[in-house]
Amino acid sequence: MIIAITILAIAIATLVIGFALGVAYRKRSYEQALDVATQTATGIIETAKKEAAASKKEAIIEAKEENHRYRSEIESELKERRSEIQRQENRLLQREEILDRKDTALDKREDVLEKKEAQLDSDQKVVTKQKEQASLLVKEQQDKLEEIAALTRPEAKELILNETKEELIHERAVMIKESEEETKATVDRKAKSLIAQAIQRSAADMVSETTVSVVNLPNDEMKGRIIGREGRNIRTLETLTGIDLIIDDTPEAVVLSGFDPVRREIAKMALERLIQDGRIHPARIEEMVDKATKDMDAKIREIGEEVIFDLGIHSMHPDLIKTIGRLNYRTSYGQNVLNHSIEVAKISGILAAELGEDVILAKRAGLLHDIGKAVDHEIEGSHVELGVELTKKYNESETVVNTIASHHGDTEPKSVIAVLVAAADAISAARPGARSESLENYIHRLEKLEDISNEFKGVQKSYAIQAGREVRVIVQPNEVSDLEATVLARDIRMKIEDELEYPGHIKVTVIRETRAVEYAK
């Protein structure tokens, strides 16, 4: 019994000790878990703080960048607005100058009218006085005759009238002759004064057009890239533009040679962009030439708009403005046609102001008098006929149309402005150094060479190059075969020999190119 109690006591004691140890172990485990959880939470908090700081820093940087972009946009917009305001101010100043000139012209007209009125009053007084003197003289002679001669009153009256009539006829003839001589002297002096004044006020520098352009290179290594493998790049550019590329020993420079200023400018723009881009191969060259051609159209329109704005001309058809811009790339006897037209417009305006005519209309007619020269190399007909058709097409006034038709004496001028423009045209063209016959003949020969080639069937376009020593003819591959290309070259050669006079030899090159293009999708 005692043993059983002892065993039971030991068991109970063991249970109590085990329970105490279990409680202590679980408490320690809880404390360790709590420490781990505390450390984990602390780590999460630190990580969250770091991420929050980084996010805050990124947000601050983005805000600064956004602020900088916004400020840049605002500054750019302000700059554009200032530029627009400046342009508007310049236009207002120019309009004020035009109005001032109009006021001056009106004042001059008023002065002339006042002088004429004063002269008329003076002449009227002289005539009245002469009539009174004649009446007194007639009366004296009548009385004298009645006293001396045994004449009746009607007989005496008839005698006196006959004598007076003869005297008056003689005096009138003398006065008319003196007036004519004085008028001629005055008119010649006034005309010379007006022309001299017009030339001085419209004096313009004139430089004879050249047939070459120079493109600067960053280094001489670029010449090899422009030439390309086996010369394919230079051949592609010459074929697309019709301009000769001359690459010689000149350091860091390439020369573009061609008689057509538009094609030469397109070639220059394309080559400069290729050099700047660095990628020079046939496909890229073709892309740049197309882009330069489009940019050239925009540049031509901008030139036309600038010209009519400078001259104070308004309400002109956009296509006619573009045609005016094309005159900048046409020459007549070596004289730039656009500069010549501007000079004629200014001289016409000055002469019109002196004579009391419409200054703006005179400038408009003067500017458009050679407008046909912008298209005479594309359409058959003289520049006078083409100019008349263009101005009628774009609803220009009858005065402008008649001015164009009559400025070379083909038709009768119907207005004072038409006569003034013809005179201004003669003044601009006849002054020393304005024109050069040799350059005009040279360009005409090259244009004729291209026209002969373009007359044949299947020809897409042709270019006269090498100063007229070679003509390259590009044909449609679906219309002209390889065998027909050989025959075409011979036919063109024979027609050139029959219709054109030239020194040396002319090489005829027919180019037939076939392309097969597919797109992989």
Curated annotation (Swiss-Prot):
Tell me the GO molecular function terms: RNA binding; RNA endonuclease activity
Q: Where are the membrane-spanning stretches?
A: 1-21
Gene3D superfamilies recorded for this chain? Hypothetical protein af1432, K Homology domain, type 1
Say which enzyme class the record assigns.
hydrolase
Give start and end of each HD domain: 337-430
What range does the record give for the signal peptide? none
Gene Ontology CC annotations of this record:
plasma membrane
Cited Pfam families: HD (PF01966), KH_1 (PF00013), RNase_Y_N (PF12072)
Name where it's found. Cell membrane
Q: What membrane topology was assigned to this protein in its record?
A: Single-pass membrane protein
Record keywords, A-Z: Cell membrane, Endonuclease, Hydrolase, Membrane, Nuclease, RNA-binding, Transmembrane, Transmembrane helix
Judging by the UniProt lineage, the source's domain of life is: Bacteria
GO BP: mRNA catabolic process
Annotated ranges, domain KH? 211-274
Q: What is its EC number?
A: 3.1.-.-
Q: Which family does it belong to?
A: Belongs to the RNase Y family.
* Matching PANTHER family: RIBONUCLEASE Y (PTHR12826:SF15)
Role, per record: Endoribonuclease that initiates mRNA decay.
Q: What is this protein called?
A: Ribonuclease Y
| Gene symbol of the encoding locus | rny
